[in-house]
A protein has these predicted regions:
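Macrodomain-like recognition of ADP-ribose-binding/processing modules
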Residues: 1-188
Length: 188
């Protein structure tokens, strides 16, 4: 398994695909989602509106179409992010509500779905933010542990894969969470 950890803006990480911690409507939002949409440009929203089918409507507002549900992965071109990356893999992480509603399992599914998507598309490298740790209030240490554990378990089920995984953090605290947990899974 080939992986790394960097502290920088995910929009500047050179790789085949960056992962967007998206919302269900996929049209941009706060945090990483907003940053990626801003960097990709308005073509990304137009592409999503015209090419990504809706799978339902919001429970809060039936006029709001859902294009990606929790744990799913949807790939789009990267538009303004090229040549930094070829594609954006959007996934919707769970909102933290205390840990009693299957949030950990749902978060793990995000990583597995993104890696499955990367493998299916022949990508050789993928950059992950700490999904759900920002606006969705997942405790950073737990989110980092689930991220690393999920990636390790995916590679155990896909030993032939040579995808490079890059964990991308924005803050020193986030970076330290990964630095503290990664040795438990690498034996170093």
């Amino acid at each position: 398994m080939n992986w790394g950890l960097v502290m920088q803006d995910i929009c500047n990480v050179r790789c085949d695909a960056i992962v967007n911690a998206a919302n269900k409507i996929m049209l941009g939002g706060a945090g990483v989602d907003g940053d990626i949409h801003h960097a990709a440009g308005p073509e990304l929203v137009r592409y999503i509106e015209n090419n990504v089918p809706t799978i339902g409507v919001s429970e809060a507002d039936e006029a709001v179409p859902i294009r990606c549900d929790v744990g799913m992965a949807v790939t789009t071109p990267s538009f303004g992010l090229q040549p930094v990356c070829k594609a954006i893999i959007h996934t919707v992480g769970p909102v933290w509500t205390g840990g009693r509603k299957g949030e950990a399992k749902k978060l793990a599914k995000c990583y597995w779905s993104c890696l499955d998507e990367a493998k299916a598309r022949g990508f050789k490298s993928i950059a992950f933010p700490c999904i759900s740790a920002g606006c969705y209030r997942f405790p950073t240490n737990l989110a980092a542990d689930i991220a690393v554990r999920s990636v390790c378990s995916w590679f155990k089920r896909n030993p032939d894969s040579d995808i490079k995984v890059i964990f991308v953090t924005y803050t020193v605290a986030d970076n330290e969470a990964y630095e503290n947990i990664m040795p438990y899974y690498t034996g170093k």
